Amino acid sequence: MSSDVSGTESGSESGPESVPEPVPEPGPEPESEPGPGPAPGPGPGPAPGPGPGLGREPGQRYQPCQLCPEHGKPLSWFCLSERRPVCATCAGFGGRCHRHRIRRAEEHAEELRNKIVDHCEKLQLQSAGITKYVAEVLQGKNQKAMIMANATREVIIQRLSLVRCLCESEEQRLLEQVHSEEERAHQCILTQRAHWDDKLRKLDSLRTSMVDMLTHLNDLQLIQMEQEILERAEEAEGILEPQESEKLSFNEKCAWSPLLTQLWATSVLGSLSGMEDVLIDERTVGPLLNLSEDRKTLTFNAKKSKVCSDDPERFDHWPNALAVNAFQTGLHAWAVNVKHSCAYKVGVASAQLPRKGSGSDCRLGHNAFSWVFSRYDQEFCFSHNGNHEPLALLRCPTQLGLLLDLQAGELIFYEPASGTVLHIHRESFPHRLFPVFAVADQVISIVC
């Protein structure tokens, strides 16, 4: 008998002459007389065989166990169009599936069994692969992770131990230098005190003797003592006035340590809750600069913008700008993205910085009111009050960080990515300070 009743597997349709006549399906086999066998169990168990999904025994005939609810005949065919089992009448001429693609239910079930077998084999292979991965790869990874973790712990302990020893040694050295400087200043002060105490006694003696001459000698005696009076006056004039000397002051440079500064800056940057939210004051932006809407980016424009230069806060010539943030006490940090610019200045300035004119008094770093780190092409320097200190950098920083400690009087420029200190300026800043910026090439922006 052909496998398709109405059309081939590829979906071609056939005419009414190819529709099979319904044939009686074999009914269920008569029950056999019970014979001797094992005692009945608690319930029906699965028949012995290869197991679920592994096919049937060779020669085992497919027997439909359900009847068509419409015709009462066995569901021995499968409609591929409606994806459901049907009887021969449904599949035959005039049936609801007459024009559909159909095949024997037995063949379709066998195909499904084969697919299940394939899936089971794939699942078995997948399970074997996962089992091997868990047993071999993960176990090896776990052992390697433990070894690496132990080695990393050892490295951390060794490095921190070395840092700790170095810090203790540096602490001892600096404390000894501070103590020595204190002793030196103290001895200088004691020496000066003894010197001036002696001079005071001598001056008192001269004054007392001259007062005694004035009160006890007559005119003739005074004339006779004229030479002695002149000598005593000359001796008094030889005692000079006290002069200010740095030797009498404690030299703070004795405590300057690149190592301590580096560690301190790194520690401070790591402990700060966050950078200052610095915003640029739009009233101060020079005519060659464009300010972004978020007030954090300055773009150089060789064409002067049509801005009102009458504002007393605005720079009317140089491409400068001040921030709205004012710092007078405490510790402050912020960073600027400078990777796109080859000509910029970043630093701090006081409110006394002149704004009008093209003179040097308005240029950042050329007056007493601004302290800036500047770059021009491949040259870097720190500038203040017309003094320009060249800085030798190994590479051009993409970001420039600033750390301002007003209590200690320190302005530190550093590279945020590595924490490398680029320059330190120490000074007792007299006024409120504002972050200040200048750009003459492309763009710089404050890091949020």
From Swiss-Prot:
Assigned GO CC terms: cell leading edge; cytoplasm; membrane; perinuclear region of cytoplasm
Where does it mainly reside?
cytoplasm
Query: Which PROSITE patterns does the UniProt record give?
Result: B302_SPRY
The record describes its membrane topology as:
Peripheral membrane protein
Q: Low complexity bias: where?
A: 1-18
Query: Where are the zinc-finger regions (B box-type) in this chain?
Result: 63-111
Q: What does the entry state regarding organ or tissue expression?
A: Predominantly expressed in testis. Expressed in brain at low levels.
Segments of this protein annotated with the region Disordered: 1-58
Tell me the superkingdom of the source.
Eukaryota
Tell me the compartments it is located in.
Cytoplasm; Membrane
On whether Metal-binding is a keyword of this UniProt record, the answer is: yes
According to the entry, every stretch annotated as the B30.2/SPRY domain falls at 257-448
UniProt-listed InterPro entries: B30.2/SPRY (IPR001870), B30.2/SPRY_sf (IPR043136), Butyrophylin_SPRY (IPR003879), ConA-like_dom_sf (IPR013320), PRY (IPR006574), SPRY_dom (IPR003877), TRIM/RBCC (IPR050143)
List where Pro residues composition bias occurs. Answer: 19-51
Q: Which GO terms describe its biological process?
A: calcium ion transport; cellular response to leukemia inhibitory factor; innate immune response
Signal sequence, start to end: none
**Keywords (A to Z) from UniProt:** Calcium, Calcium transport, Cytoplasm, Ion transport, Membrane, Metal-binding, Transport, Zinc, Zinc-finger
Briefly state the protein's biological role: May regulate epithelial calcium transport by inhibiting TRPV5 activity.
User: Which PANTHER family does the record cross-reference, listed alphabetically?
Assistant: E3 UBIQUITIN-PROTEIN LIGASE TRIM (PTHR24103)
Q: How does it assemble?
A: Interacts with TRPV5 and TRPV6. Interacts with YWHAZ/14-3-3 protein zeta.
What is the protein name for this chain?
A: B box and SPRY domain-containing protein
What organism is listed for this UniProt entry? Rattus norvegicus
